[in-house]
Amino acid sequence: VNSLKYVIIGNSAAAVGAVEAIRKNDTGGRIVIISNENHHTYSRPLISYLLMGKTDEEKMKYRDNDFYIENRCDLILGKTALKIDDSRKQVILDDGEKESYDKLLIATGSSPFIPLIEGLDSVRNKFTFTTLDNAKHLESVLKENAKVLILGAGLIGLKCAEGISRKNVKTICVDLSTRILSSILDDEGSRIIENHLKKSNIEFYLGRQIVEFKENTAVLDSNI
């Protein structure tokens, strides 16, 4: 029986689970992991705790350092899969390289939504908050008494707010919804969490939206 070649795009929880499941059923097949990050597999939900100083990069890892060696995985890190040629069973990378496969798993997770707001390109320091590099970059530019604006009062936005609130910075959250975490909590739950976060010097503008950025100043709608 010919061994299969498995290609996994992504290197987080789903990829780890896939590797372990493959090895339970196929000990000889080749596994290739492609990720646009340069890190060992880690827990993305913990990046806010990294900002808070409650964890470090080593503790964030899903598996031991020898996980890839033990499971005989070939790593392609720091490269992005741009296209899948299903007819030829190839993944085309951003450097032009092609990786063939017999079985392909896309395990990249979600991508942050970036709204189209006039002037956003003029903002000097702007970040999404889903990866370890995002958290490290944000931490590198945070200064004492700085003011941070977070667009969105969902789970990711609030975890970011919680993480940076301990850095002695002013944190402001703006959301179109009239309450925080509206997709997962009822009115009372939202109110309890909001009151708790306000004690950490986090300010909320709810039921509001940003209509324009003028360099590092945000212009909110007229509902003020």
Q: Across the structure, where does each feature detected by a protein language model lie?
A:
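A general structural signal for well-ordered alpha-helical segments in protein cores
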Residues: A15, R44, K61, I114, ...
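Glycine-rich Rossmann-fold phosphate-binding loop(s) that bind the pyrophosphate
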Residues: G10-A13, T130-T131, G152-I156
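FAD-binding core/adjacent interface of flavoenzyme oxidoreductases
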Residues: V1-V7, D64-L149, A218-I224
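Short, well-ordered coil/turn elements that cap or connect secondary structure elements
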Residues: D26-G28, Y68-E70, I76, D121-V123, ...
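Residue-level marker for beta-strand->alpha-helix junctions and adjacent short loops that shape enzyme
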Residues: N38, S111-P112, V211
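A Rossmann-like FAD-binding core segment of flavoenzymes
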Residues: L75-I92, E99, K167-I224
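Compact, aliphatic and Gly/Pro-tolerant "microcore" segments centered on a short helix or tight beta-hairpin
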Residues: L105, I117, H137-S200
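Beta1-alpha1 glycine-rich phosphate/pyrophosphate-binding loop at the start
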Residues: N2-D74, A161-I184, E188
